[in-house]
């Protein structure tokens, strides 16, 4: 299936180079399009030309690219347009070994397949405590009953620790059961002035220490902590104290947008508004997948099918921009006039 996807990507990118009718095509583009169009016309009985000039010819070439995108992604889009019918035989065209594919396309598909079939350490973009259901007021003393050291969450990436005079305790527990981190990078600081429960202000005296695995860590410096070693805080002073611990970032096996080069840009290209026809076409295609149909996904996609669909659909969007096809989509009423931000914004409502 990787070679099928690589051929589809190669052919669509070759079509995206046809930005004017009299352009001098590169030799490899002529070879790719010559073989691909010949095989496609033979199996589908369509009349795609290598140099489309009329609207009908541009439509035919775009429909060929649409067929290839759907076949490579394994999507059966169904009846979405009175002007277009998906040719299921296109998969046979893409399976033809005579159609060459570029090194770039092959490498990109190999990256998609390789990265989605395994896991690796990645810097996560969200706060470590993002999914915490409750939070506490920052800078306000809080001590649970029968405790001398109490740690609470006070933000999506922050905890604060209240300590009685002379108290020592391990706050590792508050990090457990969250996000399955491989390494946590944190910074600790003394809260110079904090409010007691009664509302009066109190100072954290110098001398409070934070240690990882028994080694004291300097305040205001990034500490690499594996989440397993003891994270102890000691208040040797004779009055209450408070400490703030910020998770700068953490590394885990969760997939991110860095798993594939320019995945963020590909997603933006897919979900961008070009006109109402593209908006309806993209929505109809993504309705047959697990991806959202109008707005980008909340979390990075982590399976091969989703990322491959985004890559192929982004390339199809480029072809749409170049060929400027005009056809109808069921349920879509094209609007005339120039494209404005207000027009694009209204399409997502």
Swiss-Prot record:
Write out the GO biological process terms.
Answer: fusion of virus membrane with host plasma membrane
Carbohydrate attachment sites?
A: 287
* InterPro entries named among the record's database cross-references: Capsid_hemagglutn (IPR008980), Orbi_VP7_capsid (IPR001803), Orbi_VP7_capsid_C (IPR023178), Orbi_VP7_capsid_N (IPR023176), Virus_capsid_a-hlx_vir (IPR008935)
Top-rank lineage group of the source organism: Viruses
- Any idea which UniProt keywords this protein has? Capsid protein, Glycoprotein, Outer capsid protein, Virion
Location within or outside the cell: Virion
Q: Name one GO cellular component term.
A: viral envelope
Q: Tell me one GO molecular function of this protein.
A: structural molecule activity
One short Pfam name that applies is Orbi_VP7
What is the similarity comment for this entry? Belongs to the orbivirus VP7 family.
Q: How does it assemble?
A: Homotrimer that assemble in a complex of 260 capsomers on an inner scaffold composed of VP3.
Q: What does this protein do?
A: The VP7 protein is one of the five proteins (with VP1, VP3, VP4, and VP6) which form the inner capsid of the virus.
User: What is the official name of this protein in its record?
Assistant: Core protein VP7
């Amino acid at each position: 299936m990787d070679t099928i996807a690589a051929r589809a990507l190669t052919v669509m990118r070759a079509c995206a180079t046809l930005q004017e009718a009299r352009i001098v095509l590169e030799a490899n583009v002529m070879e790719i399009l010559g073989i691909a169009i010949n095989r496609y016309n033979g199996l589908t009985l369509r009349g795609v030309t290598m140099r489309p000039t009329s609207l009908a010819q541009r439509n035919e070439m775009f429909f060929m690219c649409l067929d290839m995108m759907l076949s490579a992604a394994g999507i059966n889009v169904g009846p979405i347009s009175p002007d277009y019918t998906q040719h299921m035989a296109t998969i046979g065209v893409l399976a033809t070994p005579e159609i060459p594919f570029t090194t770039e396309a092959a490498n990109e598909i190999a990256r998609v397949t390789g990265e989605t079939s395994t896991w690796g350490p990645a810097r996560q973009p969200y706060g470590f405590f993002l999914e915490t259901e409750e939070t506490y007021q920052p800078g306000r003393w809080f001590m649970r009953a029968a405790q001398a050291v109490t740690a609470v969450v006070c933000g999506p990436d922050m905890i604060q620790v209240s300590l009685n005079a002379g108290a020592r305790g391990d706050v590792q527990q508050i990090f457990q059961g969250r996000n399955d981190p491989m390494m946590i990078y944190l910074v600790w600081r003394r809260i110079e002035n904090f409010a007691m429960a009664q509302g009066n202000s109190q100072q954290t005296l110098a001398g409070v220490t934070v240690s990882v695995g028994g080694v004291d860590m300097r305040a205001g410096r990034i500490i690499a902590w594996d989440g397993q070693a003891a994270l102890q805080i000691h208040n040797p002073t004779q009055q209450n104290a408070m400490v703030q611990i910020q998770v700068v970032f953490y590394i885990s096996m969760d997939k991110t947008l860095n798993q594939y080069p320019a995945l963020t840009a590909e997603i933006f290209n897919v979900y961008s508004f070009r006109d109402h026809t593209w908006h309806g076409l993209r929505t109809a295609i993504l309705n047959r997948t697990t991806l959202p149909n109008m707005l980008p996904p909340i979390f990075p996609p982590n399976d091969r099918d989703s990322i491959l669909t985004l890559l192929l659909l982004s390339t199809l969007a480029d072809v749409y921009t170049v060929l400027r096809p005009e056809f109808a989509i069921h349920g879509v009423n094209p609007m005339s006039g120039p494209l404005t931000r207000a027009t694009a914004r209204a399409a997502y409502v």
